Curated annotation (Swiss-Prot):
This is Group XIIB secretory phospholipase A2-like protein. Its main location: secreted. It is found in: Secreted. Keywords: Calcium, Metal-binding, Secreted, Signal. Not known; does not seem to have catalytic activity. PROSITE patterns: ER_TARGET. Belongs to the phospholipase A2 family. Residues 1-19 form the signal peptide. It comes from Homo sapiens (Human). Pfam families: PLA2G12.
Length: 195
């Protein structure tokens, strides 16, 4: 009995017992191809949503680093012209930040511009970019302390503002970083695959 049921399963899996249809082999192949293409597209869409969600939370395993699909290092995109740095006003979680929220502190704008340039450099490390940004912001407080003398309330307020700005970028900056890296970099094997 086991042999008969095994034979039946094998026979059905090989296409036995199916009524012959009028479809040509080309039509069957295109249906099969469409099905596989559709499944692949569905998995890629789900993967894309998952990656976007991870970027929002800070990257895979908390590491926000742009990598090519097969582990190779990304290469600078030929002819890529980075956007002009836009200061501290920008997009926050995909929403345009009103210009009134930009504090208009020239030194802070300079720090934000440096961060934009760092993010737009192919192969950049987000955490190094963020560390330079933090150092730049804290240098504003140091300069303020030197010019005003020791004023503890002003110094504390400056440090608090700088830490808030830095922590926001550190925590929620993965998505802008990844978007900048996608624009600035190219993965050679992925380009070949799309052709």
């Amino acid at each position: 009995m086991k042999l008969a049921s095994g034979f039946l399963v094998l026979w059905l899996s090989l296409g036995g017992g199916l009524a012959q249809s009028d479809t040509s082999p080309d039509t069957e192949e295109s249906y099969s191809d469409w099905g596989l293409r559709h499944l692949r597209g569905s998995f890629e869409s789900v993967n894309s949503y998952f990656d976007s969600f991870l970027e929002l939370l800070g990257g895979k395993n908390g590491v926000c680093q742009y990598r090519c699909r097969y582990g190779k290092a990304p290469m600078p995109r030929p002819g890529y012209k980075p956007q002009e740095p836009n200061g501290c006003g920008s997009y926050f979680l995909g929403l345009k930040v009103p210009e009134s929220m930009d504090l208009g502190i020239p030194a802070m704008t300079k720090c934000c511009n440096q961060l934009d340039v760092c993010y737009d450099t192919c192969g950049a490390n987000k955490y190094r970019c963020d560390a330079k940004f933090r150092w730049c912001l804290h240098s504003i407080c140091s300069d303020l302390k030197r010019s005003l003398g020791f004023v503890s309330k002003v110094e504390a307020a400056c440090d608090s503002l700088v830490d808030t700005v830095f922590n926001t970028v550190w925590t929620l900056g993965c998505r802008p970083f990844m978007n900048s890296q996608r624009a600035a970099c190219i993965c050679a094997e992925e380009e070949k695959e799309e052709l």
